[in-house]
Every structure is written in structure tokens, then in C-alpha cells.
Amino acid sequence: MLEVSNLTAIRDERVLFENLQFEIKPGELVQIEGRNGTGKTTLLRIITGLGDREEGMIKWKGEEVEKSRDVFHQDLLFLGHQTGVKRELTAFENLRFYQSIQNNSTSDEEIFTALTQVGLAGREDVPVAQLSAGQQRRVALARLWLSKQILWILDEPLTAIDKQGVKVLEALFAQHADNGGIVMLTTHQDMFADSPKLRKIKLGD
């Protein structure tokens, strides 16, 4: 379970959110809503440890994340605004690299399957620098199909993704929740309209 209590963030003397509290349980899909500038990305970065908070506490599995950082990061997959892919490597090599640093045992076939899921079949050996922005985003998203992490935190994962790609990702997110995972994301698109697993947390007015 992810627990956030009394979380406050201030940027340039402006309060983005104050005394924010929520709990997220395994099996939930959580969409962070709010206008631009209300702190959606800031919230995700604070939870992942990449951003600073004014005050508040974040717990994972009952432990403060600062005291169990290694365990938390083993359970976390974070995809931010930037794709995080290495432009000099191919799509296949990028996924192989990420799996190796996470000490995940992954076969070549599993990597090819993940790239097929995101519509990159036939582009596996193309250097990422030669792919479009949307295709580079897909390389990053392919990590989700290989992920063994429980907690997925995704900042605008649907950017530059077509309608069919959105449907595929929506199904993957729902499957992850069904398997006891947690998906926490920001997006400007309507998703999971009929899902009882969906929760929305709104920032700002």
C-alpha cells in the first residue's frame, strides 16, 4: 500500500498543494487530475524521490520510503515526461539495458514480444535516434510489458500515442491492477470510464 499524509509542495513561493492525504491499495488505478500548474508532475516526482516536499510523509508497505528506499525502488517503475531512452542504442538494446540494471532475467523473445505490443515490430534493431518522438515513447512504454514491479507511476504516458495504442495500454493497466498491481498516472485523456478500480485525485480548485 502507498500512503501519503500531510504532503505539502511549494514552488517559487506558490503553494501547489497542501496537507494532501490519500492511500492507494493493490489493485487500484489512480488518475491524478488538475489544471496545468497544479502540481501533478511535482506530486509524482515527490513520491518517486525525485522532487522535494515542504512537509509530509510517504510510506510504502507501512515503512517510510526514506528508510526503505531500496525496497521501494525495487517495487517501482517510473516513466516521466522524458522517455529516458538511450538514443545511441536500438529499441531492443534499450530494453535489454533496462532489464539488466534491474537484475531481471528476460529472454530475447520476451523483449521482441514487448516491442510488438507497442507497434515496433520490424523496428527492433533501429537506433532510437532514428525513430520518431512517438516511437521513442513506445520504446519506453514497452518496459511495462517486461515489468515485475508492483507500483507503476506514469507521467503523461499517452503523449504521442494513437487511439489504438491507448486502447492497448488501457488494457495493460487494467490487467496490472487485476494482478494486484498499482497504476498511478497523469493524463489528459479519459480512461477506464467503466472500471470500478478507478480512483481520481484532483489537485487545485
Swiss-Prot record:
Sequence positions that bind ATP: G34, R35, N36, G37, T38, G39, K40, T41
Keyword Cell inner membrane belongs to the record: yes
Bilayer topology term: Peripheral membrane protein
EC number(s) per entry: 7.6.2.5
Main location: membrane
GO molecular function list: ABC-type heme transporter activity; ATP binding; ATP hydrolysis activity
GO cellular component: plasma membrane
The protein's assembly and partners: The complex is composed of two ATP-binding proteins (CcmA) and two transmembrane proteins (CcmB).
UniProt subcellular location: Cell inner membrane
One Pfam family in the UniProt entry: ABC_tran
Protein name (database record): Cytochrome c biogenesis ATP-binding export protein CcmA
PANTHER family for the chain: ABC TRANSPORTER I FAMILY MEMBER 1 (PTHR43499:SF1)
Catalytic reaction list: heme b(in) + ATP + H2O = heme b(out) + ADP + phosphate + H(+)
ABC transporter domain sequence ranges: 2-204
UniProt keyword rRNA processing, yes or no: no
Lineage, broadest ranks: Bacteria, Pseudomonadati, Pseudomonadota, Gammaproteobacteria, Vibrionales
Job description of the protein: Part of the ABC transporter complex CcmAB involved in the biogenesis of c-type cytochromes; once thought to export heme, this seems not to be the case, but its exact role is uncertain. Responsible for energy coupling to the transport system.
Record key words, sorted: ATP-binding, Cell inner membrane, Cell membrane, Cytochrome c-type biogenesis, Membrane, Nucleotide-binding, Translocase, Transport
Family recorded in the similarity comment: Belongs to the ABC transporter superfamily. CcmA exporter (TC 3.A.1.107) family.
GO biological process, one term: cytochrome complex assembly
